Design a protein with these regions (language model features):
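PRPP-associated nucleotide enzymes
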Residues: 2-197
Length: 197
């Protein structure tokens, strides 16, 4: 997951944007959650949330936040209903963890049964680990694009190496990788080789 799609245009050679949903979707399906709702922690991630919800046939909730300054939220509001729902927040990265912790706490206050988060890139700077541990999040699922600084009971890691290996194999053999970009055509080899730590 690129932080902004426009980054793809800054390379001199053709670049394919791979989406982490390919590795996260099997994990979400394995949870077998009823009353599932996908959420975005901010307006900028709404496109990602809608992509997940389309595949999972779920509702969508968007968090609207206002900041006083960088990494400090002054106000957050939910657009949508989470009462009686199992919510999964999806984002491309988690830095200080403030937004996700705030969103999870707000959703639990509004009646969510459980709140999980899926973030591709776990930067986890500052007091992020403590914020996650002390938040209403049931668990945080991340990829291994950035190694974790420490282990914690709430954080699970899903490896993206099977996805990369499959795409490199496909490119090397001059076959199409378009299936890697569609949520509903997740490659069976990748799904079967995904590991969770």
């Amino acid at each position: 997951d690129l932080h902004a799609d426009q980054i793809q245009g800054f390379f001199e050679k053709p670049v394919d944007h791979l989406y982490a949903s390919t590795i996260f979707m099997p994990y979400i399906n394995s949870l077998k959650l009823e009353n599932l709702t996908i959420a975005s922690p901010d307006m900028g991630g709404s496109k990602r949330a809608y992509a997940y919800s389309k595949h999972l046939h779920s509702d969508v909730v968007i968090c609207y936040k206002q900041r006083k300054k960088a990494n400090v939220i002054s106000h957050m509001e939910l657009i949508g209903d989470v009462k009686g729902k199992n919510v999964i927040l999806v984002d491309d990265m988690i830095d200080t963890g403030g937004t996700l912790a705030h969103a999870a706490n707000l959703m639990k206050e509004r009646g969510a049964l459980s709140v999980r988060a899926i973030c591709t890139h776990p930067i986890l700077s500052g007091g992020a680990y403590e914020k996650i541990e002390n938040s209403a999040l049931t668990e945080l699922i991340v990829s291994d694009t950035i190694p974790l600084k420490k282990a914690t009971s709430k954080i699970k890691v899903v490896s993206c190496s099977p996805l990369f290996a499959d795409v490199m194999h496909t490119v090397q053999n001059n076959t199409s990788i378009s299936g890697q970009f569609l949520l509903y055509t997740i490659n069976k080899k990748v799904m079967n080789s995904i590991t969770i730590k």
